C-alpha cells in the first residue's frame, strides 16, 4: 500500500452511552493504539486493551473502531464488562497510533524477494516517522537560525528551581 495520509490520531466526546469510537488510519495489530480518556478536569487515563476496550479492523487501510466495554448482558460478548468502561459526558477520547520501534522483516539470502513484506516494512517505517513528527509538532522549538548547540538547559536544576517558563 502507499501511505497517502498523515493522520495518526482521532478524538471524540463521550456521552455515557456511546461505546464505539472510530479511528481513520491503518494499524497492523490491535495493540498498535494508545487510547486515552481525558476528564473535564484535564486528568488523562490510558486505557488497557481487552480490559477497557477492544479494537476492530487491524490491518485495514481505512481504520476501524475502538469499542469500549460495558455490561451488554452477555458475558460471551466481546464488549462485555461487569463495569461500564464507556467514556462519560465531559470526557474526551483520544485514539493514537503508537507502534513499537522495532523492525521484524528478515530477508534471507537467495530467497525470492517478498515484495509484500518489503512494502509492509516501508509502511511501518513511514508510520513511525509520522508518529515522531506528531510528537515534534507538539514540542517547543527554537528557530532554525538559533545558535543553540545543546538540548540541555544551561542553568543548573538549583538555579531553575521556583522559576517560571515565560514568553513575550
Locations of the language-model features?
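N-terminal assembly/attachment segments of tailed bacteriophage virion structural proteins
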Residues: 1-122, 131, 135, 149-166
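Extracellular/luminal recognition modules and glycoprotein regions
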Residues: 139-150
Amino acid at each position: 500500500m502507499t501511505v497517502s495520509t498523515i493522520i495518526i490520531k482521532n478524538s471524540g466526546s463521550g456521552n455515557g452511552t456511546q461505546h464505539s469510537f472510530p479511528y481513520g488510519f491503518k494499524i497492523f495489530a490491535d495493540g498498535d493504539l494508545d487510547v486515552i480518556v481525558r476528564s473535564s478536569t484535564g486528568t488523562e487515563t490510558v486505557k488497557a486493551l481487552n480490559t477497557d476496550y477492544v479494537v476492530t479492523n487491524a490491518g485495514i487501510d481505512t481504520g476501524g473502531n475502538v469499542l469500549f466495554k460495558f455490561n451488554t448482558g452477555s458475558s460471551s460478548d466481546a464488549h462485555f464488562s461487569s463495569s461500564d468502561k464507556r467514556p462519560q459526558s465531559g470526557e474526551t477520547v483520544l485514539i493514537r497510533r503508537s507502534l513499537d520501534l522495532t523492525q521484524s522483516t528478515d530477508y534471507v539470502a537467495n530467497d525470492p524477494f517478498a515484495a509484500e513484506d518489503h512494502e509492509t516494512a516501508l509502511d511501518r517505517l513511514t508510520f513511525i516517522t509520522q508518529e515522531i513528527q506528531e510528537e515534534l509538532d507538539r514540542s517547543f522549538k527554537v528557530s532554525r537560525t538559533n545558535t543553540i548547540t545543546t538540548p540541555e538547559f544551561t542553568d543548573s536544576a538549583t538555579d531553575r528551581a521556583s522559576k517560571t517558563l515565560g514568553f513575550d
